Swiss-Prot record:
It comes from the Bacteria. This is ATP-dependent Clp protease ATP-binding subunit ClpX 3. ATP binds at residues 125-132. Zn(2+) binds at residues 12, 15, 34, 37. SUPFAM superfamilies: Glucocorticoid receptor-like (DNA-binding domain) (SSF57716), P-loop containing nucleoside triphosphate hydrolases (SSF52540). NCBIfam families: clpX, PRK05342.1. GO terms for molecular function: ATP binding; ATP hydrolysis activity; ATP-dependent protein folding chaperone; protein dimerization activity; unfolded protein binding; zinc ion binding. Belongs to the ClpX chaperone family. Signal peptide: none annotated. Keywords: ATP-binding, Chaperone, Metal-binding, Nucleotide-binding, Zinc.
Length: 435
C-alpha cells in the first residue's frame, strides 16, 4: 500500500515566508505572494505614481510673457493685472518645480534659502474678468482649479460651507490625486464680503465675516489639513477615508469688487482739505480716475475697508482690474478666441444658419451692458434675450439660411431678420442681373 507524497510546502516568492494558517499566500502562474508583501508592493507602486505625478508637474513652467500672451487670447484689456498675475504664477510654479526636483534627486538641495509663496488678491468692479483670469491661469499651467464663493463660507460647526470643503472639491478636481491637489489653484470670489461690519454688535459672533477670515488663515499660509477623500478615484477605496493635504504649495487667489475702497485710497493720497479762507491753497478740481486709485491700493486701505491685517498679509500680490468701457465690451464680444458672438455663431451653424451681428448691433449690446452695470457677464443675458425666439423657431424651419441682428433688434424695435433659401437665391439672381 503506497502513501501519497507529502504536500510541498509553499513559500512567498518575495520574502520566503512559509504558508500557514495565519499566513495565506496568493498564488500566481510562477509564484506566490503573502499579505505583507502585497502591502509593501502597494506602497512601492503608490510611490511610483507620486513620482510620476511630480515629474509631470515639475515640467517646464511657461515664462511670464508666454503666460500673458495666452491670457491675451481670452481676456480683453487689464494689461497691468495680466502682467502682475503672469509674474506671480511663474514665480510660484518655478519655486515648486525646483523643490520637486530636489525631492526627486534631480537637483542639488539648498537648505539655507526657503522661498515663500505669494498669494494674489485681485481687486476690481464686478464683471471685469477676475474669475476668467484665475481659471485661464490654471488651464495654462495645467493644474486643478476650484472656485469658492466667500459669501457661502462659515466657520466650522455653522450652517453653510466650511473652509475644509474647498480642499475636498480641489481633491475631486485633481481626480483624487493628493499630489496634484497640492499644486492646485483655489480662487475665492467675493472676498470683500468678508470685511468686518462696523455695525456688528459687540456680543454677536461674526461667523461669516471676520470668523471666516480667521478660518482661512491656516489654509492660505500653509498647513496639514485632513479632509474626506470623496474625490479619490485613483487611489482611494472605502468610504470614510481621510487624507492629509499640505496647503503650503496651493496657490490661493482671492477676488472682490471692494466697493468704496477707492475712497480710502483717495483720502490717503489726496491733498488735505482742512484749510479755508482767502489764503488757503487752491485745490485741483480734477479727481483721480477709479483705475488710477485702484492702482495705488496699499494694505492699510484694505485694513480700513474691513479685512484683518493677518488676512491681508497672506495676499502680498495685489492685482487691480480696471472698469470696462464700451470699446472694451465691443472687443470682448468679438475678439477673444471664445468670444460670445463666435459661440452663438457656432450654435446657429449647427442648424446650417449663418448668424450675423451688424456693427451698430454690437455697439448697442455693449452700451446696454454699461447701462445695466453688470459687467462682462451681463453680455450673455442680453444676447440670450435677443436670440431666444429665433433659437426656438429655427430648428423647425429647414429653409432658414441666415439670421441678422441689427441695432433696432437690440433695442426691441424690430425682430431679427431671417433670410430663407428662396430669398437668398432671389437675391443672388438679382445681384447677377437675372431678375
Amino acid at each position: 500500500m503506497s502513501s501519497d507524497p507529502p504536500a510541498k510546502t509553499q513559500h512567498c516568492s518575495f520574502c520566503g515566508i512559509e504558508q500557514g494558517r495565519d499566513t495565506p499566500l496568493i498564488a500566481g502562474i510562477e509564484g506566490q505572494i503573502c499579505e505583507a508583501c502585497v502591502r509593501l508592493a502597494e506602497q512601492v507602486v503608490a510611490n511610483w505614481g507620486r513620482k510620476r505625478s511630480m515629474a509631470e508637474l515639475h515640467g517646464n513652467v511657461p515664462k511670464p510673457e508666454d503666460i500673458k500672451r495666452h491670457l491675451d487670447q481670452y481676456v480683453i484689456g487689464q494689461e497691468l493685472a495680466k502682467e502682475i498675475l503672469s509674474v506671480a504664477v511663474y514665480n510660484h510654479y518655478k519655486r515648486l518645480r525646483h523643490e520637486s526636483r530636489e525631492i526627486l534627486g534631480l537637483a542639488g538641495s539648498d537648505t539655507e534659502v526657503q522661498v515663500g509663496k505669494s498669494n494674489i488678491l485681485m481687486i476690481g468692479p464686478t464683471g471685469t474678468g477676475k474669475t476668467l483670469l484665475a481659471s485661464t491661469l490654471a488651464r495654462i499651467v495645467g493644474v486643478p482649479f476650484v472656485v469658492a464663493d466667500a459669501t457661502t463660507l462659515t466657520q466650522a460647526g455653522y450652517v453653510g460651507d466650511d473652509v475644509e470643503n474647498i480642499l475636498v472639491r480641489l481633491l475631486e478636481a485633481a481626480d483624487g490625486s493628493v499630489e496634484r491637489a497640492e499644486w492646485g489653484i483655489v480662487y475665492i470670489d467675493e472676498v470683500d464680503k468678508l470685511a468686518k461690519s462696523p455695525e456688528m454688535a459687540i456680543n454677536t459672533r461674526d461667523i461669516s465675516g471676520e470668523g471666516v477670515q480667521q478660518a482661512l488663515l491656516r489654509f492660505v499660509e500653509g498647513s496639514q489639513v485632513k479632509v474626506a477623500a470623496r474625490g479619490r478615484r485613483r487611489e482611494g477605496s472605502g468610504g470614510g477615508e481621510e487624507v492629509t493635504i499640505d496647503t503650503r504649495n496651493i496657490l490661493f487667489i482671492a477676488g472682490g469688487a471692494f466697493p468704496g475702497l477707492e475712497r480710502h485710497v483717495e483720502k490717503r493720497i489726496g491733498p488735505p482739505r482742512g484749510e479755508i479762507g482767502f489764503h488757503a491753497p487752491v485745490q485741483d478740481a480734477k479727481r483721480p480716475l477709479l483705475e488710477e486709485l485702484l492702482a495705488e491700493i496699499q494694505p492699510e486701505d484694505l485694513r480700513r475697508f474691513g479685512l484683518i491685517p493677518e488676512f491681508i498679509g497672506r495676499f502680498p500680490v495685489i492685482a487691480p482690474l480696471e472698469p470696462l468701457d464700451e470699446a472694451a465690451f465691443v472687443r470682448i464680444l468679438t475678439e477673444p478666441r471664445d468670444a460670445l458672438v463666435r459661440q452663438y455663431q457656432k450654435l446657429f451653424a449647427y442648424e446650417g444658419v449663418e448668424l450675423v451681428f451688424t456693427e451698430p448691433a454690437i455697439r448697442r449690446i455693449a452700451a446696454r451692458t454699461i447701462e445695466r452695470d453688470t459687467g462682462a457677464r451681463g453680455l450673455r443675458s442680453i444676447i440670450e434675450h435677443i436670440l431666444r425666439r429665433p433659437m426656438f423657431e429655427i430648428p423647425s424651419q429647414s429653409d432658414v439660411r441666415q439670421c441678422v441682428v441689427d441695432a433696432d433688434t437690440v433695442d426691441g424695435k424690430a425682430p431679427v431678420t431671417l433670410v430663407r433659401a428662396e430669398e437668398e437665391a432671389g437675391g443672388a439672381r438679382l445681384a447677377a442681373g437675372e431678375v
